[in-house]
C-alpha cells in the first residue's frame, strides 16, 4: 500500500521545447482541450440563433447573464459592459479546466513523463491568469483616471505608499496561489483515496471536488471583477 502511495507524483512534467524554451506539455494539451470545448460550445450556440432560446443557446445565454451579473455587481452599472468578455473568459476557462480535472481520470492516460491534470493544477497557469487580472486592474484605472490613478498610492497620507504598493503585488499572488492550492490539493486527495480504496470512498470526495471547482471559478472571476471595480472607483 505504501509503495502505491509513492506513485502519486507532484511536480513532474512532460517538457516540450518550443523556441528554445521548455514548456509543460501536459498543461498545453489540456489547455487546448479546454479551449476547444469552449469554442465548440460557442459555435453550436450561435449557429442558428432563435428568438426563444433552447438547448446550447439557452445555456450560453444563461451563462452570459450570470457573468454579466458578476461584472455589474463588482464593477458598477456604468462601467461593467466592456469587462463582461474578460470576466466571462476567466470564469469559463477556469470552470471548464477545473471540471475536466475533477471528472476525467487522467491517470489512466500514461505519458512518457508527468501526468495529465487540470491546467489550473499548474502554478504557471494560475499566475498567468492572475497577471492578466493585474494588467486589467492597472489598465482600467489608468484609462478612467489617467495619471490621477496613481494618487491612490498616497491616499489618505503618503505614509501608506509602501503598503498600497505591496497590496497591489499581493493581489495576483493571493489569486494564483488560492486557485492553484485548492485544485492541486483536491487532485492529490482523490489520487491517494483511489489508491487506498478504489471503489466507493473516492466518490464523495470527487463530488466535493466538483463543487469546489465551481466555487473556485466563481471566486477568481468575482475577485478579478472586484479589483477592476476598485481601480475605477
UniProtKB/Swiss-Prot annotation:
Please state the protein's primary subcellular location. plastid
Q: Which CDD domains match?
A: ATP-synt_Fo_a_6 (cd00310)
Q: Does the keyword Lipoprotein apply?
A: no
Origin superkingdom = Eukaryota
Supply one GO molecular-function term.
proton-transporting ATP synthase activity, rotational mechanism
Which residues, if any, are the signal sequence? Answer: none
The name under which this protein is listed is ATP synthase subunit a, chloroplastic
Amino acid at each position: 500500500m505504501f509503495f502505491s502511495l509513492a506513485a502519486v507524483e507532484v511536480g513532474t512534467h512532460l517538457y516540450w521545447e518550443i523556441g528554445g524554451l521548455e514548456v509543460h506539455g501536459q498543461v498545453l494539451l489540456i489547455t487546448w482541450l479546454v479551449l476547444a470545448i469552449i469554442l465548440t460550445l460557442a459555435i453550436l450556440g450561435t449557429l442558428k440563433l432563435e428568438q426563444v432560446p433552447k438547448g446550447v443557446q439557452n445555456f450560453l445565454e444563461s451563462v452570459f447573464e450570470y457573468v454579466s451579473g458578476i461584472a455589474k455587481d463588482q464593477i458598477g452599472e456604468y462601467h461593467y459592459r466592456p469587462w463582461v468578455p474578460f470576466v466571462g473568459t476567466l470564469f469559463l476557462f477556469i470552470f471548464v479546466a477545473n471540471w475536466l480535472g475533477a471528472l476525467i481520470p487522467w491517470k489512466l492516460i500514461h505519458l512518457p513523463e508527468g501526468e495529465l491534470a487540470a491546467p489550473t493544477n499548474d502554478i504557471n497557469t494560475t499566475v498567468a491568469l492572475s497577471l492578466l487580472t493585474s494588467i486589467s486592474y492597472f489598465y482600467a484605472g489608468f484609462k478612467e483616471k489617467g495619471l490621477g490613478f496613481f494618487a491612490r498610492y498616497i491616499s489618505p497620507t503618503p505614509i501608506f505608499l509602501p503598503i498600497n504598493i505591496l497590496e497591489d503585488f499581493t493581489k495576483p499572488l493571493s489569486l494564483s496561489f488560492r486557485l492553484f492550492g485548492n485544485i492541486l490539493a483536491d487532485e492529490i486527495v482523490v489520487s491517494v483515496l483511489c489508491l487506498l480504496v478504489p471503489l466507493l470512498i473516492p466518490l464523495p470526495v470527487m463530488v466535493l471536488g466538483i463543487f469546489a471547482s465551481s466555487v473556485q471559478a466563481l471566486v477568481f472571476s468575482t475577485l478579478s471583477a472586484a479589483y477592476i471595480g476598485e481601480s475605477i472607483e
